[in-house]
Structure formats: C-alpha cells, structure tokens
UniProtKB/Swiss-Prot annotation:
GO biological process: phospholipid biosynthetic process
Protein family according to the UniProt entry: Belongs to the diacylglycerol/lipid kinase family. YegS lipid kinase subfamily.
Cofactor (UniProt): Mg(2+); Ca(2+)
Keywords for this protein: ATP-binding, Cytoplasm, Kinase, Lipid biosynthesis, Lipid metabolism, Magnesium, Metal-binding, Nucleotide-binding, Phospholipid biosynthesis, Phospholipid metabolism, Transferase
Residues given in the record as Mg(2+) binding sites: 211, 214, 216
Enzyme Commission (EC) number: 2.7.1.-
Cofactor: how and how many bound: Binds 1 Mg(2+) ion per subunit. Ca(2+) may be able to substitute.
Lineage of producing organism: Bacteria, Pseudomonadati, Pseudomonadota, Gammaproteobacteria, Vibrionales
Protein name per Swiss-Prot or TrEMBL: Probable lipid kinase YegS-like
Active-site residues per Swiss-Prot or TrEMBL entry: 270
Top EC category: transferase
Ranges of residues in domain DAGKc: 1-130
Protein purpose: Probably phosphorylates lipids; the in vivo substrate is unknown.
Localisation per UniProt entry: Cytoplasm
Length: 299
C-alpha cells in the first residue's frame, strides 16, 4: 500500500471536496494520513514527525503561504531524509501552483500528488527565511491577492495606471543599495521582484521566463519616474533588459540588499521586514511533484 502524509491548512480542513477526494483515494488503496496545522509552529513539527515516521512524500493543502511553510520546514531537514513535496492548491491566490500547472481541481491535484513524478527544484534563502515562488519588495510588497485591480495592473503590464495609483496611495521610493553577481545598484527603488517562479499577487506575471530548476532568480527593479517618463517605463516593462533606464531585469544566483530603513518585503505573500537581506538560491534543494506539462522546469 502506498502511503502519503497530507498536511492541511486548518482553515481548509473541513472542505467537503477535499474530504471526499481523500476518502476516494483511500478506497483505491492509498494510505492517506491526515494532519492539520492551526498555528505557525505546527508545520515544522508535522514535517519532522513525518520524517521520523519514514514518510517519503508529503502533500500540503492550502495557499501559497502554506506551500511556503512546507518548503521552509523541508529545507531544514537533512537532504538524504527530506521527503518529496506535493501541493493541493486551496488558497485565495495559488500563484505557484498556477504557474507550474498543478491542477486547481482538488481531486486531480490529489491524483497528481499520489501518482506524479517528483523533480528536483530550487528554493531561495532570504536570511534565515526561504521562499519557493516570489519575494516582492517595496511597492511590490503591497501587492497581494486582495489589492485593487488598478494597482495590480502595473505588474500585469498595465503601467498606465501606476503614476496615479502611486500618488493616490502615497507610495514612496526606498533608498538603498543592491549588490548582485557582477554589479551593484545604488539609489531609489519603487519595486523589487526576486522571482524563483513566475506569478505573484494573484496571477500577475512578474517573470515570464523564470525556471524553478536553473539555479537562478529572475530579478526586476523599478526605479521612480516622472509622469512624462511613463511611455519609456511601459516600453521597458514590455521589453525587459539589464540596460533599462527605469526597469532593470537580470538573473543571479545571489544578491544582497542594504537599506537605511527596513524594507517591506513579502516572501510568497508572507510579510517580512529587514534592513539587510541576502538572497541565495539553493539549487535543486527540494523534490516537488509536478505535472508533465509544467512549463517552469527545464525537463
């Protein structure tokens, strides 16, 4: 009998569709063992418990925050003992699952979790934290699934709304330095996006070419601009390069940011503030169950 350990976000544990899918999978002879998280320290404890019990595959059911909790817990497990990870997307925003073509149907996602192949993928450490999807800084840290669509449009390419929105909501640029392999950026930043995968903020495409197994982050930095410079900004958003005047795009395996004041940041949607942060890709550090048509792996 095949055994998997399902760890459910407590807010989703009563989902009737999820319960039905688990029961049907058990009827097929799969031993689906269920655990539930209620508090922030539950995930690390339950992951350690699974390792002690010899579980080889963990399935987490929840949103991007739950996936982040699981990845963060797994990265602290010795590599040889680290279970594989599968995902049932149940959040408000399921950006990582969506980008990687993990089914949004609970039954189909559970079937993939049981039958799918695990591939080695990267995660990114940010000081003592980690993320598997996207870290957004500055203005970008405010962009979540609940953000008004006018604000999110900027990250989807509709930058014509940005100037008015920034003025209306009083966003101010952040002044500091960013050091990456082969370069350094000093000055004001409106938005920083450090991407392992492609989507954030409820489906906004931040890094359309990012791969989760290439050992690199896709980085986008946007510096402040004046209203008459907006056409140039839009052009650079649509045609990102390292040489953009306002929008700079590059790839790197590590970067360090140093700001006089703590920079607002979110890691897979989870808030984090720090003045100095080192981001470092952990290549192929997790084994993740993915569909065969996943566009974010090099195959």
């Amino acid at each position: 009998m095949k055994t998997i350990r399902a760890i459910l976000n407590g807010k989703k544990a009563g989902n009737p569709e999820l319960r039905d899918a688990i029961m049907k999978m058990r009827d097929r002879g799969v031993d689906v063992q269920v655990r539930v998280t209620w508090e922030s320290q539950d995930m690390p404890r339950l992951v350690k418990e699974a390792v002690t019990d010899g579980i080889e595959r963990i399935v987490v059911a929840g949103g991007d925050g739950t996936v982040n909790e699981a990845a963060s817990a797994l990265i602290h497990i010795d590599h040889e003992s680290r279970p594989e990870l599968a995902i049932i997307p149940l959040g408000t925003a399921n950006d990582f699952a969506t980008a990687n073509h993990i089914p949004d149907s609970i039954a189909d996602a559970l079937t993939l979790a049981v039958e799918g192949q695990a591939l080695s993928v990267d995660c990114v450490k940010a000081n003592d934290r980690c993320f598997i999807n996207v870290a957004a800084a500055g203005f970008g840290a405010e962009v979540t699934a609940e953000t008004p669509v006018e604000l999110k449009n900027f990250l989807g390419g509709g930058a014509y709304t940005l100037t008015g929105v920034v003025k209306a909501l009083g966003f101010k640029p952040y002044d500091g330095s960013i050091t990456i392999e082969g370069g350094r950026y000093d000055g004001e930043m409106l938005l920083g996006a450090f991407c392992n995968s492609r989507l954030a903020g409820g489906g906004q495409q931040l890094a359309p070419n990012a791969m989760i197994d290439d050992g690199l982050m896709d980085l986008t930095l946007v510096r402040p601009f004046l209203p008459h410079e907006l056409p140039k900004v839009i052009e650079e958003i649509n045609n990102p390069s390292e040489k953009g005047e306002f929008v700079k795009h590059t790839r790197a395996s590590w970067l360090e940011i140093d700001f006089p004041n703590p920079l607002p940041l979110n890691l897979d949607g989870e808030p984090y503030h720090s003045r100095k942060i080192r981001f470092e890709v952990q290549p192929k550090s997790l084994k993740l169950v993915l569909p065969k048509d996943c566009p974010c792996v090099t195959h």
